[in-house]
């Protein structure tokens, strides 16, 4: 039995109980727990050897196809070999071919039984008796004249199972050899009836001239005669290098020690060639084939078959050799093809595109000093750099292209009118009012729609977008115009940019008494970038110091040339407070729209537009202010806006009245979203809620990946020590009344530049009041909650007081920015500035056994102060730094300080002083960080 065996299997094989086997193993020094335990092959061999092998043969009634102790011979083999078997005289008893025993264990026979020369016609499957020591004293020196002729009268069996070779530990079964060996067993083989010296297949001399080198002498597992006819379970010493009269195993194949041996007591199945390896028991000697049995420890029993490599294998090997090595890792080599990746893609996504192993990309970046996991979002530069090293062109897909591809996967399009020219109808113009803060934009809209919106704004500053549609009576014709009011404060850049993209015409409001300001220039840039025509409204002409001509001259520098100066920009002087020239301004807007714009849309398609603003209402839930750009929005439609989706449950106009449908250029408030959409997100109507949910989920995942790639800190191995140092960090949780305000506040706060030592991090943001969940998060992360135009809800205030969480409320954005900036500056580590105190020259040195060297000094300037910091100068060269004046005396009295012009004695925390040295004292003063 080659390989491991269980105790109960051995007990069944040996015909004893498992307890007896366990006891016998314990006597042999082997610790085995139970009958289900396995023992190694050497242990099983020693166990069988201790039982003498007889019980094994009695228990095996038929040969086993997967026996572990040795290979058995098929019962049909003796019938095909009727010829007499040469060999020394032995007392051999033929056994029935129906029950051949297994090899190598042999049945117990009398030890003194000599070998018989009787013919062994049925003995091919009969185990050979062990030869006495006197019967085979050494190798038979018969000649080996090369290949021998086939044995007359003894045809080879058509198929036989050769025994396992010289390896007692082999777990593989021998392979059948139907074809005869081309090389005979060596030596003269007489015909039938002739005696020979090989009971197990003929003599095996140790060497044959011209066929093989001499076989080394020594122990050989599985070979050699056994003195006294004792059983030979699997191996033992083999003093003679020649033939093997193995009980139950047959002699080794003639020729040399690499030849295959025959089965139990029969002549070898083929001549021994030099092709098999040791352990190829029944293998043939033909070139290019393995031995019939396995080698030691499961290795193949012969030399592997070597074939010619295919062209594909050679090409793959060549390409692998030519593959680029990045960071010591061999990576695939591209042909310059373009790989499209989404923003925030991971190395797994990149590896999937190029059929590479993600682990190799991770290892390559790690060796280059970049620590990234396979599923972590990677920045665009890292992907492009890695792709360039492998000869790939990495193209990071823009968010717009990625969103378009996402919609195309659902057979949806955005931004195009369906149908032909006959389906398009005239729509009202969308006008955005832009300008610097406090220049009168909201007052102008109030005058147009006869409302008072400005008084409701905190500080008189518009902090969210307002969208209104008013009907203007122009020359007896009612013309609807949609107005969008944008903030003018510098923190609302993104909101102004959204207003410019969603508009048809921009009204630029400039105060005649203030002139062109930074946000005025920014509004001009946004409008020009969106290719939107601009109508300039010069406001506050009724105030003292107003100079409309000056405004025209200033705006000329930015490409806005008035029509009276030969340009194409329309300028209207107005007074929003007095209502002067408002109709002229509206007329200019209508004329500009009719003259230079094609304002048409298809109202019969599914609605599409943009979410101008969104907020969380306590009673109504998420509310989004949307502007319909094409199509008609109806109650009950399934909509998706950004990563929010839902079904339109209710629509409200600017007057608070319910509407059932909204046509193009109509702003309405939509109620029914499952979450708050982002300000500026595109919205569209889809057929089913399922499609809307899938689109929203994919957009949300894309946004998370992009955010992770943008906010992930690039930590290299060189910067790891500094990155692990403690840095001051201010965590914030932002809550506001609408999403646009929260977005603007976050951008303004993150734009505060204080120092690299402190970091501002917004860990959460949302629309609505401060909740207990926000307080718990702030408590766990040591964060401050910023509430903008909102208050704490319910028990959130009590929880915040109990947990020690600070909640700050603001209604004006620049107050929040100033206070957060001050808090960041207060978190800076202090910077100390050196302030000189005085200088003293050493005139004499006194030595003391208690305190060491005492310096007798004359204070030249300033003061000498006890415990002050000092440095020692010698010839204007600093000798020692960071010293301390440990003691200071004037005459014999201890003093705290000595002024200039006086002598003193002092000791330093430094003993190597000389006369003429100068002691300079200083103190460190904390400097305010800015």
Curated annotation (Swiss-Prot):
Domain tr-type G, first and last residues per copy: 426-598
Residue ranges, compositional bias (Gly residues): 192-204, 241-301
Extent of Basic residues compositional bias: 305-314
Residue ranges of the region described as G4: 539-542
Coarse class of the protein's main subcellular location: cytoplasm
Ranges where the record places region G2: 460-464
GO molecular function annotation: GTP binding; GTPase activity; translation initiation factor activity
Source organism superkingdom: Bacteria
Binding site for GTP: 435-442, 485-489, 539-542
Cellular-component GO terms for this entry: cytosol
Nucleotide-binding listed as a keyword: yes
Sequence ranges of Pro residues compositional bias: 81-120, 136-155, 180-191, 228-240
Annotated region (G3), positions in chain: 485-488
Key word GTP-binding present: yes
Region (Disordered), start-end ranges: 29-316
UniProt family annotation: Belongs to the TRAFAC class translation factor GTPase superfamily. Classic translation factor GTPase family. IF-2 subfamily.
Function: One of the essential components for the initiation of protein synthesis. Protects formylmethionyl-tRNA from spontaneous hydrolysis and promotes its binding to the 30S ribosomal subunits. Also involved in the hydrolysis of GTP during the formation of the 70S ribosomal complex.
Name recorded for this polypeptide: Translation initiation factor IF-2
